[in-house]
Amino acid sequence: AVDGISYTFPMGEKITVGVGNDYAGSSLYSTACVYGGPTKGLDDCGNAMSAMDASEATGLSASFDIGNGFAAAVGYEGEGDTASGLMTKEGTDTYGAQLSYSADQYAASLTYANYDTSTTDTTYWGLNGYWTPAETGTAVPSISVGYEVGNPDNTSVDTSHYLSLIHISEPTRLQDI
């Protein structure tokens, strides 16, 4: 069974655009995390909400290579499978942006998302980073950290955080960011 259809394409040398049904608006984000796990709870690296990924949403994303290790991305997800429609007051719409920096052994990213429903607007911010040793297979682990804060307009502040120490003996196991 087909669970989603998407299309990603370049627009020049520095811009990539993606669009699709059942497509995460954060698909072209460069979240700074070296861990990739089998469960969403572990591999979201502490930014489960700011790195928006609604199921069954129509999505659009774009990434921009700024240069010198910097990248920016924007994304949108909308409730397109119901009568509520895209970008309506009744529908659920999420939009976000990310600024990231990556170097050979470390990276950082700042992610923003706004979830807009018919009753609540919730803003999330996520900050992530990682460092990997120059040589893998040593006793020194890779380190990934993440912190997220959410502020629903009708409740108190919501936070999540993440720390992982990963010891990898084969460099081919590292997630390409």
Name what the model sees in each region.
Residues 70-111:
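Loop-centered beta-sheet repeat module
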